[in-house]
A protein has these predicted regions:
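Glycine-rich phosphate-binding loops of nucleotide-dependent enzymes
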Residues: 1-292
């Protein structure tokens, strides 16, 4: 990045004009002499010189003049964190040369894991969600009431995505193109597909399950509104949406299953700053209502 910026500055000093389109605010602050902000297809303001700050850009991008910068935002304290353990990792190992991982996740906590790309966090998260098998160890999840009644056990070992789903675990991938969206299906189908039940029938209107359409429509409309998803006609292909709105649909899909535990792998990838703030707010609401 630094080499690119240095080359751009050299070209500018030689008289070249450079036009950059980006949602990466830090890049604009570091490289731009003038910045125009667009919101919903409208030019909402132009900044120049010392006016190009993170706070000013965020204010124009979100329409909120009091918008706080990322460095000023602090996590909202949880209402309560229970002593009840809902997920545990026991001697979990996801890399040959990695350490064993042991931890307990109490109900009502938001646990963050970070690291540079390619340092094992993707393998770790997928092992927790039952997508990939760890090299050793196990992931234990408290079962849903339905599964506990059926198996007579409070906890179960997660060996697959189906095991996780039965125990009320929802997952959102950070790679929507490879692991998230169904590109040949509509926006609507992409969001509510986990709710389809029973034998499916193919018609000109798409896949129809045995859940009442009224209920599905209500769920779809609710998630669109609360996550501020700009969808257009819901029967349009998911690929008609911007990357950020595709990501929101994936997050909404996880919420439609009313999970007890949400595992999110880089959930804010490709989402604008205002939507990130809304997402984090909804995650806090989720845990305050009993989720983890």
């Amino acid at each position: 990045t630094e080499r690119l910026f240095a080359k751009m500055r050299t070209l500018r000093d030689q008289g070249a004009a450079i036009f950059i389109v980006t949602h990466r605010i830090a890049e604009l602050v570091r490289i731009s002499d003038r910045a125009t902000v667009m919101r919903d297809g409208v030019d909402v303001g132009v900044l120049a010189g010392d006016e190009i700050t993170e706070k000013n850009l965020l204010g124009l991008m979100t329409g909120d003049k009091k918008f706080s910068t990322a460095s000023e935002i602090k996590a909202t304290p949880p209402n309560s964190i229970s002593d009840e353990i809902v997920l545990s990792a026991k001697d979990l190992k996801v890399w040959d040369n990695g350490d064993f991982i042991n931890f307990d996740l109490p109900k009502g906590e938001i646990l963050g894991v970070t690291g540079l790309d390619g340092q094992g966090q993707d393998n770790f998260v997928k092992a927790l969600a039952g997508i990939d098998q760890p090299l050793s160890g196990e992931v234990i999840v408290k079962q849903s009431d339905e599964e506990r009644e059926r198996t007579k056990k409070d906890y179960t070992t997660v060996n697959s995505l189906l095991d996780a789903k039965k125990s009320g675990v929802g997952y959102v991938s950070g790679d929507r193109k490879k692991e998230g969206i169904f590109p040949n299906m509509s926006i609507y189908e992409n969001m509510v597909i986990p709710l389809y039940k029973g034998k499916q029938a193919k018609t000109s209107g798409g896949f129809i399950g045995f859940i009442k359409w009224m209920e599905l429509n209500g769920i779809f409309d609710w998630e669109v509104e609360r996550l501020s998803i700009k969808t257009g006609p819901k029967n349009n292909l998911i690929t008609s949406l911007s990357g950020g709105n595709q990501q929101k649909v994936m997050i909404a899909r996880a919420f439609t299953t009313t999970p007890k535990i949400l595992i999110l792998n880089d959930p804010a990838r490709g989402i604008d700053v205002g939507a990130k703030r809304d997402l984090y707010k909804h995650l806090r609401i989720f845990v305050n209502e009993g989720g983890t």
